[in-house]
Amino acid sequence: MKAIIVKPPNAGVQVKDVDEKKLDSYGKIKIRTIYNGICGTDREIVNGKLTLSTLPKGKDFLVLGHEAIGVVEESYHGFSQGDLVMPVNRRGCGICRNCLVGRPDFCETGEFGEAGIHKMDGFMREWWYDDPKYLVKIPKSIEDIGILAQPLADIEKSIEEILEVQKRVPVWTCDDGTLNCRKVLVVGTGPIGVLFTLLFRTYGLEVWMANRREPTEVEQTVIEETKTNYYNSSNGYDKLKDSVGKFDVIIDATGADVNILGNVIPLLGRNGVLGLFGFSTSGSVPLDYKTLQEIVHTNKTIIGLVNGQKPHFQQAVVHLASWKTLYPKAAKMLITKTVSINDEKELLKVLREKEHGEIKIRILWE
């Protein structure tokens, strides 16, 4: 079958025919691939920059792709022929308690597999076989934006985790019982920053997006339709602090030099949460004893945010459907481009490089 393969830790990517018998199979349901999503993780693997990416045992290549929508070929165990489905990409170690109850996002051994990334073949191939417990149904009404359910699942889990952490505060809701008075700063306005903004606004929190430039057309649409605030941070964050004050939640969605944290930690308010989502690959954070004392004395929390599981995929499906009503203009702009699997030149280009203003590029299997 045709597949997109990589050979981590080496850079490079190929579209080639491979022997199906040499590829990982995960169950009995045959799924024909319709769409794959491309994200920063894929590009880091393609460009040889993701050090945690490893080959499946005994193999010299890895099928790329952890974002996919496919169609069920034969009815089986609650799934009907023709159903659209999305696979959950992280699979448990089979040892620790969290993995045994379907939560490998909290794997205690670190021996989990991640399709298309770590130890498991991914879904950038013509078809694959899977287990029902790792499949989420995608309504045909959101087929146009459904590929976003995978990255959105990670954001669903992240916000769920933040809200769970904030239960440590006796009262974190506002005087009307909502979260409408809580302020969030989302640093970084790429695909992840946009999804964080949309979901925080859906929950009712007040949001500021920040980047070192003016917003793109897509970002401007999100800002206007969700009534989000925007701050150009090219000259630092002093003006934001003076005009808005401190924030209840700060999200680092930049994936940029980690030095950015030194600029935003002073913006975090009492009892606040700093959520780290982006994977920085350079820099260091200057933390003196006074900053650490303040973190302790004012009950601040710093938390790593990663990987949604099946419940979060299901929540993502619901929210994507709701955004087509709540934020219809933004929803229509979330898929930046669709590239045919048969257009190899363009395909290899988008697998290597992010396009300006990109939210999500998807591959169409024809």
Curated annotation (Swiss-Prot):
It catalyses: D-glucose + NAD(+) = D-glucono-1,5-lactone + NADH + H(+); D-glucose + NADP(+) = D-glucono-1,5-lactone + NADPH + H(+); D-galactose + NAD(+) = D-galactono-1,4-lactone + NADH + H(+); D-galactose + NADP(+) = D-galactono-1,5-lactone + NADPH + H(+). Inhibited by EDTA in vitro. Substrate binds at T41, N89, E114, Q150, D154, N307. Its EC number is 1.1.1.47, 1.1.1.359, 1.1.1.120, 1.1.1.48. Optimum pH is 9. Optimum temperature is 77 degrees Celsius. At 37 degrees Celsius, shows about 20% activity as compared with the maximal value. SUPFAM superfamilies: GroES-like (SSF50129), NAD(P)-binding Rossmann-fold domains (SSF51735). Zn(2+) 2 binds at C93, C96, C99, C107. GO terms for molecular function: aldose 1-dehydrogenase activity; D-glucose binding; galactose 1-dehydrogenase (NADP+) activity; galactose 1-dehydrogenase activity; galactose binding; glucose 1-dehydrogenase (NAD+) activity; glucose 1-dehydrogenase (NADP+) activity; glucose 1-dehydrogenase [NAD(P)+] activity. One of its GO terms (biological process) is protein tetramerization. Zn(2+) 1 binds at C39, H66, E67, Q150. The keyword Oxidoreductase applies. Its cofactor is Zn(2+). Catalyzes the NAD(P)(+)-dependent oxidation of D-glucose to D-gluconate via gluconolactone. Displays broad substrate specificity since it is able to catalyze the oxidation of a number of alternative aldose sugars, such as D-galactose, D-xylose and L-arabinose, to the corresponding glyconate. Can utilize both NAD(+) and NADP(+) as electron acceptor. Physiologically, seems to be involved in the degradation of both glucose and galactose through a non-phosphorylative variant of the Entner-Doudoroff pathway. HAMAP family: Glucose_DH (MF_02127). This is Glucose 1-dehydrogenase. It comes from Saccharolobus solfataricus (Sulfolobus solfataricus). The lineage of its organism: Archaea, Thermoproteota, Thermoprotei, Sulfolobales, Sulfolobaceae.
